A protein has these predicted regions:
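Active-site neighborhood of phospho(di)ester-bond hydrolases with catalytic His/Asp-centered motifs
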Residues: 1-6, 22-23, 74-78, 102, ...
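Active-site environment of divalent metal-dependent phosphoester hydrolases
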Residues: 3-13, 42-46, 81-85, 108-126, ...
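Conserved catalytic scaffold of divalent metal-dependent phosphoesterases
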Residues: 6-97
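Binuclear metal-dependent phosphoesterase catalytic core
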Residues: 28-30, 99-105, 109, 117-148
Length: 148
């Protein structure tokens, strides 16, 4: 499973093989509800970059599905949430709307990328209220219990 990053313009024509894009989806796997939202803060012209308002609108379009499934277990994004492992410069600022999702639905896990650990600004694992936040930059294995 994957969501688009800010440098994934080539995926519009040639998506990666052997995986499923969950961008703008509430994907369910063996009872595990996974909400996918790719992209970063808009800092230049290009695909998969959004303003705060655009990201909020993307989430609003998924609201009925989220409500019907009674929330989600994993939030998978490219960018972090605002104030939770993000940076100060525009390309690395997080989205307010992601933090709003964490506040409203309290998923067990929030998995994001974009914040390269060699930047020295971000921890691999952190916690926000009841949600474990994982910066999955490069790769990271997470064992997540499947709901009964």
């Amino acid at each position: 499973l994957y969501v688009h990053g800010n440098h994934d313009e080539c995926y519009a024509d040639t998506p990666p093989e052997g995986c499923i894009c969950i961008d703008d989806c509430l994907y369910e796997y063996q009872g595990l509800r996974i909400l996918g939202l790719g992209g970063s803060m808009r800092y230049r012209p290009g695909d998969f970059q959004y303003t705060q308002k655009e990201m909020t609108w993307r989430i609003r379009k998924l609201w009925f599905k989220i409500r019907r499934k009674k929330g989600f277990d994993l939030l998978v994004t490219h960018s972090p949430a605002k104030g939770l492992g993000d940076g100060e410069d525009l390309p690395h600022q997080g989205f307010d709307a992601f933090r709003d999702l964490l506040d409203k639905y309290a998923p067990p896990f929030f998995i994001h990328g974009h914040m390269h650990l060699n930047y020295g600004r971000s921890k691999r694992i952190s916690q926000y209220q009841q949600t474990i936040i994982v910066n999955a930059f490069e790769k990271y294995v997470i064992e997540c219990p499947v709901p009964e």
